[in-house]
Amino acid sequence: MGLTKVKHIILVLSGKGGVGKSSVTTQLALSLTSAGHSVGILDVDLTGPSIPRMLSIEASKVTQVPGGWAPVLVHEADESKGLGSLHAMSLGFLLPKRGDAVVWRGPKKTAMIRQFLKDVLWDETDYLLIDTPPGTSDEHISLAETLQKDATLGQVAGAVVVTTPQAVATADVRKELNFCTKTNIRVLGVVENMSGYVCPHCSECTDIFGSGGGKSMAEEFNVPFLGSVPMDAQFIALLEEGQRPTYPSGTTVGGKDISTKETETRTQEGNLVDKYQDCSLSHVFKDITDKVLVNVGG
C-alpha cells in the first residue's frame, strides 16, 4: 500500500464549498514543513482539484514508477533552514488541460480515490493531509472505508474541520462533525476561516462575515477550536503572482505586529514556503499547527 511510510494521516473536511478548505490545507502543509516535518498533500476533490494551483505547480506531471505513481515534488527538505520536504498528488496533474471538466459517476470516483490511496507511493512522510470535497458524498464514504480497511492502527490521526463564521456554513459543518462521529474519525479541531479581512492599505482587520460561529460550534460538539483565520489579499497575491507579502506600518494580526519595516528589503526570490514566512497568515497558522500537533500527539 502507498501509505506504508506515512506516519500520520489528517483529513481536511468542510460541510460546504467556498469556505477555503484547500487554502487551509495548503497553509497547514506550509506551516508543518516550516517546522521541519516532511509533508504530503493528497487532493481527492476530484471535480474541483485546486491544490496544484495553490502550490503553483500546475504544469507538473506525475511520474510512473514501479508499483505506482510518485507524487509531485513541491520543494526538497533543507536541514540548514529547518525545512521539511513537501510533495503533492492531485487529479489535476493527470488532466490534459487545466479547464477540463471531470464528469464522473460515483463508482468511478470511488475507484479513483482507492487507487490514489493504494498506488501513490509516498516516501517517508510525517504528515499526509488529505484535501476532501465539500459535504459528505461518495468520495468521503470511499475514503473512510478504505482507510479503515488499509491504514494501520493509529495511522489516521483525525480530521480538521473548516467553516466560516456565518450560520449557513456552521449548519452544514455540523453534518460533517456527525459524519466523523459515525465513521469513528477523531476531530482534531475546528478552524474558522474568513474570520475578518486584513486591509491591504492600513492596519485594520474587519469582521465582514461576523465571527465566533466556529468557536461556538466547537464548544457545542465538545471538540477543540484551533483558531480563526482572516482573509489577506497578500496571501492571494502570493499564490496567484508569486509576490512576497509586505504590510504597511501598524499592521497587526492576532496581536502580532507584522509590518514591513522601512529599512527592510524583501526580494521576490525564493520558493513558496520561503515567501509564506512573510505572510500575516503564517503567524496564525503556526498557532493552529501547534494545536494540531498537540492533539495528534506528534
From Swiss-Prot:
UniProt: ATP binding residues: 15-22
Cofactor binding: number and manner: Binds 4 [4Fe-4S] clusters per heterotetramer. Contains two stable clusters in the N-termini of NBP35 and two labile, bridging clusters between subunits of the NBP35-CFD1 heterotetramer.
Parts forming coiled coils: none
Keyword vocabulary terms for this entry: 4Fe-4S, ATP-binding, Cytoplasm, Iron, Iron-sulfur, Metal-binding, Nucleotide-binding
Any one GO BP annotation for this protein: iron-sulfur cluster assembly
Pfam families for the chain: ParA (PF10609)
Binding site for [4Fe-4S] cluster: 199, 202
A GO MF term: 4 iron, 4 sulfur cluster binding
Subcellular location: Cytoplasm
Co-factor(s): [4Fe-4S] cluster
Annotated region (Disordered), positions in chain: 246-266
GO cellular component: a single term: cytosol
Assembly and binders: Heterotetramer of 2 NBP35 and 2 CFD1 chains.
Family: Belongs to the Mrp/NBP35 ATP-binding proteins family. NUBP2/CFD1 subfamily.
Job description of the protein: Component of the cytosolic iron-sulfur (Fe/S) protein assembly (CIA) machinery. Required for maturation of extramitochondrial Fe-S proteins. The NBP35-CFD1 heterotetramer forms a Fe-S scaffold complex, mediating the de novo assembly of an Fe-S cluster and its transfer to target apoproteins.
Name of the protein in its database record: Cytosolic Fe-S cluster assembly factor CFD1
Organism encoding this protein: Gibberella zeae (strain ATCC MYA-4620 / CBS 123657 / FGSC 9075 / NRRL 31084 / PH-1)
Gene name, Swiss-Prot/TrEMBL: CFD1
